[in-house]
Each structure stands twice: as structure tokens, then as C-alpha cells.
């Protein structure tokens, strides 16, 4: 379970969500906080039963087999994803319908021009987090490629076993996960038959040691990526298309206009320090599709 009762209560109260879908592992936390969330009217439980809950399978069975899709605009709200709260309480970032399509150029590049025939995706990133959702699950499904799911607690042995068993070709692995794998199984190809062809890594700096290990031990050059909940997949590497270096965050992914600027908003020269800035308009002059609509209730 990614969130405990307090974290769930905060998000449900702030978002005024009226419906929750949960499973057996998450239901006790929802039950414990339900009285504190007045907007929450319905709880749908998957493979579990509780007081005042609806059964997922029954609810699905009672729905009509045909429906009319709702017409939406690219700037209409699609997702409310809460940040990790690095600088205070988590903030609800309201994402537009265009966010997934905007992510795809970076996803394709960071996964060495995904998809190829036979590609299979796996990542330990939780699908409730923007990284697991927008950098793994939804892009893989968009391209009609299988993605492996596992509820087991992460370990190096689990990672290598899953990748071997399901012939995983592409993955999103945090630098911390790669460090754990490197320490536990220094020479993985001596023990596992792997088919990895691309790894994207984000969330923190990869570092020289991990970068060099993935090349030598896994036969893959890790593609480091930079993004955040509010504007994802904007800068990174693609070893299949341009040289990737340890310690380099890469280049702007296709379509995005990115610069390093000073306090006056002007681009700095090579070798100078500044802030990474994403232009609100893409390289075609249109609003960049990955940029969030705003913070919920703020």
C-alpha cells in the first residue's frame, strides 16, 4: 500500500473525491478515514467486502455493454496527481488530456525508440505515482505492448527473475533500484538470461558507478531523464540516437523548448550555472502538452 491513512485522508479531503476504488490491502485504510471525508460517497472494493462498500465485479456486471465516449478537448482536465510534497504539503497537479501524448516523445526516445516487435515493459514504479503511471503503464498500453505487474516487495532477485521470466526488454528503474541490483548481483548475466535493450532512470542522479555498471553488466546504456509531476519527460538521453554520458541530463526531448537561464530569464552561456526552464509553448508554437493546468485549490 503506497499511502497510509493520513496521506489518503489528506488527498481525499483536498480533492473532495466522491468515489474510491480499492482492493483488499487498501480497504482497511479507507474504512478508517471514511468518516473524515464527507465528500466520499462511494467505495468500490475489488475482491474484498466491507461495510457500505460496492463490489467491483457486481458493479461492472450491472453496467451496460455499450456506451458513448465523452468528447473532450486537449486542455480539459484528465488526471489529478499529487506531488510528493518536497517543499510542503503535497499539491494536487491537475493534468490536461494532452499530457499522455506530450509524454510520448520522451518515452519513445528514452526507451530507445519504443516500441519494437516483441517489446515487454516492466518497472517497479508504483502506478499510483506519476512516474509509474505516465512513464510506464499508460505509454506501454498506448502502444499496445504488454506491461508486467507485480505486487511483491522490490528486491534485486525479484527484479532479475521477473525480467528473465517475462523476457522484459524495456524498463524504468530508479537509480536507487539500480544500486540495489548492482550490489546484490554484480554480474547478472552470469545468472539470468536477460533481453533488456533499454532502461530509463529518473528521480535522482544516476552517477558514474551505476552508469558504467549498467553498460558493462547489463549491456545497456541507461538513459537518464529529467521531469516532474507538473511537466514531465522534458529532458533526457536516448543512447540509440545520441551519445549519453554519465552525469549528463541529456537533451530536450523532441518538441520541447528548454533552456538554462539566469535570474533575469536570459539563457546562460556554456559552462555557466542557471535554472532549467521549459517554455510554455512547444517548438511548433503551440502550448506544450505536458504542462499541468494548475494546482488544485490553489
Show which residues each predicted segment covers.
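Structural core segment of the AMP-binding/adenylate-forming
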Residues: 1-58
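ATP-dependent adenylate-forming carboxylate-activation enzymes
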Residues: 1-12, 24-29, 126, 145-166, ...
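A short helix-loop-beta submotif of the ANL/AMP-binding
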Residues: 1-5, 10-19, 119-120, 138-148, ...
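Conserved pre-ATP/AMP-binding loop-to-beta segment of ANL
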Residues: 45-51, 61-82, 89, 113-120
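Conserved AMP-binding A3 loop
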Residues: 78-105
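Conserved AMP-binding/adenylation subdomain of ANL enzymes
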Residues: 101-123, 128-170, 183-184
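Gly/Ser/Thr-rich phosphate-binding loop
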Residues: 142, 168-173, 182-244, 257, ...
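Conserved ATP/PPi-binding loop(s) of AMP-dependent carboxylate-activating enzymes
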Residues: 252-255, 266-298
Amino acid at each position: 500500500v503506497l499511502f497510509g491513512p493520513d496521506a489518503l485522508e489528506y488527498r481525499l479531503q483536498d480533492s473532495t473525491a466522491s468515489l474510491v476504488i480499492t482492493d483488499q490491502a487498501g480497504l482497511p485504510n479507507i474504512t478508517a478515514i471514511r468518516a473524515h471525508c464527507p465528500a466520499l460517497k462511494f467505495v468500490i472494493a475489488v475482491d474484498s467486502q466491507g461495510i457500505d462498500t460496492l463490489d467491483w465485479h457486481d458493479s461492472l456486471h450491472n453496467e451496460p455493454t455499450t456506451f458513448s465516449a465523452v468528447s473532450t478537448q486537449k486542455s480539459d482536465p484528465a488526471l489529478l496527481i499529487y506531488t510528493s510534497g518536497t517543499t510542503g504539503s503535497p499539491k494536487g497537479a491537475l493534468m490536461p488530456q494532452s499530457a499522455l501524448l506530450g509524454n510520448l516523445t520522451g518515452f519513445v526516445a528514452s526507451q530507445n525508440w519504443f516500441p519494437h516487435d516483441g517489446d515487454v515493459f516492466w518497472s517497479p514504479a508504483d502506478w499510483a505515482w506519476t512516474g509509474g503511471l505516465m512513464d510506464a503503464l499508460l505509454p506501454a498500453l498506448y502502444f499496445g505492448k504488454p506491461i508486467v505487474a507485480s505486487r511483491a516487495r522490490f528486491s534485486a532477485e525479484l527484479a532479475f527473475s521477473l525480467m528473465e521470466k517475462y523476457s522484459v526488454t524495456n524498463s524504468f528503474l530508479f537509480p536507487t533500484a539500480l544500486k540495489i541490483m548492482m550490489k546484490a548481483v554484480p554480474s547478472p548475466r552470469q545468472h539470468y538470461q536477460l533481453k533488456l535493450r533499454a532502461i530509463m532512470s529518473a528521480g535522482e542522479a544516476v552517477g558514474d558507478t551505476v552508469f558504467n555498471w549498467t553498460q558493462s553488466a547489463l549491456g545497456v546504456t541507461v538513459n537518464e531523464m529529467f521531469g516532474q509531476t507538473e511537466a514531465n519527460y522534458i529532458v533526457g538521453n536516448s543512447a540509440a540516437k545520441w551519445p549519453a554520458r554519465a552525469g549528463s541530463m541529456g537533451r530536450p526531448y523532441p518538441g520541447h523548448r528548454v533552456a538554462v537561464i539566469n535570474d533575469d530569464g536570459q539563457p546562460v552561456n556554456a559552462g555557466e550555472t542557471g535554472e532549467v526552464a521549459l517554455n510554455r509553448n512547444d517548438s511548433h508554437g503551440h502550448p506544450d502538452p505536458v504542462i499541468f493546468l494548475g494546482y488544485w485549490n490553489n
